[in-house]
A protein has these predicted regions:
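Catalytic alpha/beta active-site cores
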Residues: 1-178
Length: 178
């Protein structure tokens, strides 16, 4: 029986057929709407360009830079660096991002909440020192504000205020960073 063997019954109470025919989609609004146009049923992007991102754990900035430059030649166009406090210095930032076109490659950083402000300032200063057009440079600063509370059972005082401050300083230094 088709319904018994092939139709998936979801927990939300609707059935999903394994295939659809033209008459199944005749009255759907999605067939007339275009991607990137109101009412955004098919998303806000009008193109299908995706970033190919590679995460790199930074134990040694020179090794991480070498790995980053190597994978950039293989089609990657977004890098994610996991950075510890010891590596957040102007010298290390210069070594980490050496020979990387930061205006055209998305650069993302992961660190802990204690080091986020220092990382934002160091990155902003480095971009300024090499005359990067910050309206073109894209990326993000990422940290988990609840990690300390969940892992150690200790509250991080004023984490919401600090998060707002970090977002403000990052948006001033690097407007296209999230």
């Amino acid at each position: 029986d088709f319904n018994k063997k092939l139709v998936w019954r979801t927990n939300e109470g609707f059935n999903v057929k394994p295939m659809y025919r033209a008459e199944d989609t005749e009255n759907l609004k999605t067939t007339d709407s275009r991607p990137g146009e109101y009412p955004y049923i098919r998303g806000t992007k009008s193109d299908n360009n995706w970033l190919i991102r590679q995460e790199i754990i930074v134990d040694d900035v020179t090794v991480a830079n070498k790995k980053a430059n190597d994978i950039l030649t293989k089609g990657v166009n977004s890098l994610g660096f996991h950075v510890e406090e010891a590596h957040i210095t102007p010298e290390n930032m210069a070594a980490l991002l050496k020979d990387i076109d930061v205006e055209n490659i998305e650069i993302n950083f992961h660190t802990c909440i204690k080091n986020a402000a220092k990382l934002i300032e160091t990155t902003g200063a480095y971009y300024k020192s090499i005359h990067v057009d910050t309206t073109k440079a894209k990326g993000s600063f990422n940290y988990d504000p609840f990690k300390r509370m969940l892992k150690r059972g200790r509250d991080f005082a004023n984490y919401a205020t600090q998060a707002a401050s970090l977002i403000k300083s990052a948006s001033e230094l690097l407007p296209k960073f999230r």
